[in-house]
């Protein structure tokens, strides 16, 4: 959640941030009203408690009828105190709900607008010219079939639409990508983590995924648990309710986990293949650091993402995501999009967000800096989302006979230079 002091002291700044995201600014007035109600409820409760304490001092000194009258008054006042306490709890809950509904304040540098209002920051590499190579590129579905790497028919038979099996070279390619990603992360100072893919509601809500993204989340009926759409969720909750040593920051983690997404708003989009699926595996970078250092750390996360894509010898671009497409918790987000030859366009492969103090305030994670305890910041960044990366690698490095050249960085993990077709 945002800093309550910013809401109280700079409400116009919060209103402007809402408008920049394309959202109504009425939520600001609602939150300020809830804050006022909460303060009045606290004052009323404290006044009743003070009256109760004062009355308690008079009773031992009273005698006879006066004492009986005071005792009767005590009973009445006790009920009023209980009522005032309940009213305070209701007001506090309403205030917290109002505050939690406000998204992080988008960075001044983030473009205004929605999904299509991003700004292209740079383009790296040149999309391959298949005409010059003398053949028409196959899409990843056909390549996956020829290589015996992707089985969509059996995925649909067993689990339904947007599911798949990775087999043979496909399974090997996933493991190679995970190993390469984890090797890079470890060499860059990250601690490898295998994260749980089921979490309690607080972890999901604390990361902002029960707000705008609630429709895309799988809930396990009868258990009050959720399947995560990214290991950002368990890693943000990893240090919940903790005070970290400020001198030990940054803490960098590289977490591997399955990711589950309903893709509720994606009807009719990418219905074939493995670009948009209900389940995929991912290596995610996650960082705890000071707010002051978070902006430079964000650039470092982007640099590590770019390094990984360049190891895979992919043409890609970096975009500055517009405020309306940031999601609840992000202050700023950069996406790396790889060129997909058969689609003739760039598609998102990685994303990195600076969430500043938004998640740590919700999850009560703070840092100790000498005698001071204060909120810290979190950042996240995709190092390798497996299925989309497989799509980009297969389509970019395919050869005329349906074989696929293995990028040099992956060759030690795959043990060969070329993936050969098993069928035509």
Curated annotation (Swiss-Prot):
It comes from the Bacteria. GO terms for cellular component: cytoplasm. Pathway: Aminoacyl-tRNA biosynthesis; selenocysteinyl-tRNA(Sec) biosynthesis; L-seryl-tRNA(Sec) from L-serine and tRNA(Sec): step 1/1. It catalyses: tRNA(Ser) + L-serine + ATP = L-seryl-tRNA(Ser) + AMP + diphosphate + H(+); tRNA(Sec) + L-serine + ATP = L-seryl-tRNA(Sec) + AMP + diphosphate + H(+). It is an enzyme of class 6 (ligase). The keyword Metal-binding does not apply. HAMAP family: Ser_tRNA_synth_type1. L-serine binds at residues 230-232, 284, 382. Its main location: cytoplasm. This is Serine--tRNA ligase. NCBIfam families: serS. The keyword Nucleotidyltransferase does not apply. ATP binds at residues 261-263, 277, 348-351. Catalyzes the attachment of serine to tRNA(Ser). Is also able to aminoacylate tRNA(Sec) with serine, to form the misacylated tRNA L-seryl-tRNA(Sec), which will be further converted into selenocysteinyl-tRNA(Sec). InterPro entries: aa-tRNA-synt_IIb (IPR002314), aa-tRNA-synth_II (IPR006195), aa-tRNA-synth_II/BPL/LPL (IPR045864), Ser-tRNA-ligase_type_1 (IPR002317), Ser-tRNA-synth_1_N (IPR015866), SerRS_1_N_sf (IPR042103), SerRS_core (IPR033729), tRNA-bd_arm (IPR010978). GO terms for biological process: selenocysteine biosynthetic process; seryl-tRNA aminoacylation. SUPFAM superfamilies: Class II aaRS and biotin synthetases (SSF55681), tRNA-binding arm (SSF46589). Homodimer. The tRNA molecule binds across the dimer.
